[in-house]
Regions:
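Catalytic helix-loop patch of NAD(P)-dependent Rossmann-fold dehydrogenases
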Residues: 1-39, 46, 50-52
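Conserved active-site helix of classical SDR/Rossmann-fold NAD(P)-dependent CH-OH oxidoreductases
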Residues: 20-27, 60, 88-89, 115
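Alpha-helical segments that scaffold the active site and NAD(P)H-binding pocket
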Residues: 27-31, 61, 96
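Active-site micro-motifs of SAM-dependent methyltransferase domains
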Residues: 31, 44-47, 154, 175
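Active-site loop/turn elements of alpha/beta-hydrolase fold enzymes
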Residues: 42-45, 74
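C-terminal substrate-binding subdomain of Rossmann-fold SDR/epimerase-dehydratase oxidoreductases
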Residues: 63-199
Length: 199
């Protein structure tokens, strides 16, 4: 089932626990002290300017450096991908049209498992879809993130523009290819961190 604004939180890692805790604190401040705030939870972003430690930019920049992608576990972890530009327009709509104290979920119905993401990236970059290595999965790695954006769509009239994931990935590959000067200074430190963690 997809996560809805009324789904009880059930965090499975310190990371997800910290996110759940922050939402609960905001709700308490709104209710107790009248703070004018909304909450937005988004699905996984991709697109220009994303830090190269993240899944998609790391796969792209590794390929651009001649390094085979490395996929955690079996790669069947599902993420609900949303282009960063769509995320931005959704946040703007929430800030300008959202109701105080409400929670809005930002997603683009882009559920795709990580193995398929790597296969698409490989194809778009001229490699065989299965040209990647499997590595040990991270502890506490959630199997599926998917959210129900219907409240955002029905109440605020928001709609994603980047609905073709493959086209969005092609644009993202082009951006990282054309902007190596932006990410190259970060690459060595990012890969050293992953190597130190055994990934």
């Amino acid at each position: 089932a997809k996560f809805t604004p009324t789904t009880p939180y059930n965090p499975s890692s310190p990371y997800s626990s910290s996110k759940a805790g922050s939402d609960l604190l905001v709700r308490a401040w709104v209710r107790s002290f009248g703070v004018e705030a909304t909450i937005s939870n988004c699905s996984n972003n991709y697109g220009p300017y994303q830090h190269i430690e993240k899944f998609i930019p790391r796969m792209i920049t590794n390929r651009l450096r001649g390094v085979r992608p490395r996929l955690y576990g079996d790669g069947l972890n599902v993420r609900d991908w949303i282009h960063v530009r769509d995320h931005n327009t959704a946040v703007w709509d929430i800030l300008t049209k959202g109701r105080i104290g409400e929670t809005y979920l930002i997603g683009a119905n882009g559920e795709t498992n990580n193995r398929d993401v790597v296969a698409i990236l490989n194809e778009l970059m001229g490699y065989a879809p299965d040209d990647f290595d499997h590595v040990t999965d991270r502890p506490g790695h959630d199997l599926r993130y998917a959210i129900d954006n219907s409240k955002l769509v029905t109440e605020l009239g928001w709609e994603p523009q980047f609905t073709n994931f493959r086209d969005g990935l092609a644009d993202t590959i082009a951006w990282y290819t054309e902007n190596e000067a932006w990410w190259a200074p970060l690459k060595e430190a990012v890969e050293a961190k992953y190597a130190a963690e055994g990934h």
